[in-house]
């Protein structure tokens, strides 16, 4: 799960903390169901953008539901595929929540990030980086694609 509270400063932090608390309290279920759970329970905040992803290793897919300007990408064998995040603000205005499934292959990277990163990054500019630890991929994206005047969050995970 990745979230970004709407706005800046303490009010945005309240929204982000509420998302984290509700995510921890949510029943283990599909990404869509978890996102619906969070949406209903953070209405007292100014809202957030939220992405929830779940690996299904048996089916070799990732299930994903996202609302707002969260960038979500699967990188497999050098090919980048965007995952769909629908418009809206969790806790306030959404037209619906949908869950999508995306195929994964061995060594696929799943990258989620907030709008604090420019989404025009290209892992091909860093030969061999995709084979390194996910934390190094995340740190490199944060360093080189981070917007200096915005907070940023990055989540990178790898399949095996």
Residue ranges and their predicted role:
Residues 1, 6-160:
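Conserved subregion of the PPM/PP2C metallophosphatase catalytic domain
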């Amino acid at each position: 799960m990745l979230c970004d509270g709407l706005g800046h400063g303490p009010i945005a932090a309240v929204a982000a903390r509420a998302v984290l608390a509700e995510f921890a309290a949510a029943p283990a279920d599909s990404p869509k169901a978890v996102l619906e759970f969070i949406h209903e329970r953070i209405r007292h905040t100014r809202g957030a953008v939220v992405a929830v992803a779940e690996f299904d290793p048996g089916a070799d897919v990732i299930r994903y539901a996202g609302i707002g300007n969260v960038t979500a990408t699967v990188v497999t064998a050098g090919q980048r595929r965007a995952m769909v995040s629908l418009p809206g603000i969790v806790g306030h205005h959404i037209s619906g929540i949908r869950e999508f499934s995306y195929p994964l292959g061995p060594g696929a990277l799943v990258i989620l990030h907030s709008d604090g990163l420019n989404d025009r990054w290209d892992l091909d500019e860093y030969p061999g980086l995709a084979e390194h630890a996910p934390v190094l991929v995340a740190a490199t994206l944060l360093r080189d694609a981070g917007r200096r005047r915005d907070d940023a969050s990055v989540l990178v995970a790898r399949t095996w």
